UniProtKB/Swiss-Prot annotation:
Record PTM: Highly phosphorylated. May be phosphorylated by the serine/threonine-protein kinase Doa.
Protein localization: Nucleus
The protein's name: Serine/arginine-rich splicing factor x16
Domain RRM: 8-81
Originating gene: x16
Species assigned in the record: Drosophila melanogaster
Alphabetical list of InterPro entries matching this protein: Nucleotide-bd_a/b_plait_sf, RBD_domain_sf, RRM_dom, Znf_CCHC, Znf_CCHC_sf
Segments of skewed composition (Gly residues): 86-103
């Protein structure tokens, strides 16, 4: 049995959020028998794999470091944690905490001087206490909040624009409906408001003048029409002599022949 169980424990970093235990068992099981596999969920992105033999763990580190694991190019190396009293394995590497990386509880605070942070590469603290990581999280949260506020403003503007357009369309429709109704009824569109009397009934229009009234007016005023008629009359009528008849002319002609 090895003096430090961390010699058999392998840290797997730079994993995606969708890494599964079965996938890690399949990949690392090709190098030897496994004791346990633990995947971090809060925060995600790393895992610990413990082998039965330290030699198998070293072979897995040499063969898988920088290779694609669970769809991501992973970083594989031996865990740097010391032997823990709980027997859960070494802490170290990638924010496993002082207690254990294979499902053990986090017991420490900021870590020891020989602990390595896999976020910034520095020593003396764990990844979950890394300042650079917290700064990145704050930037992500700020950008997400700004994007949400921008999308909300766009939605409110679009809703107000559609409401105003619908209101204007409704008012135009009501106006056109009123005008059409008046045209169909006929009475409302023909007569204006000042042509209605106090009771609301429409005053009937005056009847048109008759033709003979126009002629009488022309005669009285001496219009050109009456003058032309008087000029066209025969001279006998103007002198006051009675008009000749056809019978009289024929009788005079017969007497002259005799």
């Amino acid at each position: 049995m090895s003096r430090h169980p961390s010699d058999r424990k392998v840290y797997v970093g730079d994993l995606g959020n969708n890494a599964r235990k079965n996938d890690l068992e399949y990949v690392f099981g090709a190098y030897g028998s496994l004791r346990s596999v633990w995947i971090a969920r809060n925060p995600p992105g790393f895992a610990f794999v413990e082998f039965e033999s330290a030699r198998d763990a070293a072979d897995a580190v040499r063969g898988l470091d920088g290779r694609t694991v669970c769809g991501r190019r992973a970083r594989v190396e031996l865990s740097t944690g010391k032997y823990a009293r709980s027997g859960g394995g070494g802490g170290g590497g990638g924010g496993g905490g002082g207690g254990g990386g294979l499902g053990g509880r986090d017991r420490g605070g900021g870590g020891r001087g020989d602990d390595k942070c896999y976020e910034c590469g520095g020593r003396g603290h764990f990844a979950r206490h890394c300042r650079e990581r917290k700064a990145r999280q704050r930037r992500r949260s700020n950008s997400f909040s700004r994007s949400r506020s921008t999308s909300r403003r766009r939605r409110t503007r679009s809703k107000s624009g559609t409401r105003s357009r619908s209101r204007s369309a409704g008012s135009v429709g009501r106006r056109s409906g009123r005008s059409n109704g008046r045209d169909e009824n006929g009475s409302a569109s023909r007569y204006s408001d000042h042509e209605r009397n106090g009771s609301g009934a429409v005053d009937s229009p005056p009847p048109p003048k008759r033709r003979y009234e126009d002629e009488d007016d022309d005669r009285v005023r001496g219009s050109p029409r009456s003058r032309s008629r008087s000029r066209s009359a025969s001279p006998a009528v103007r002198r006051g002599s009675p008009p000749r008849r056809r019978g009289d002319s024929s009788a005079s002609r017969s007497v002259s022949r005799d």
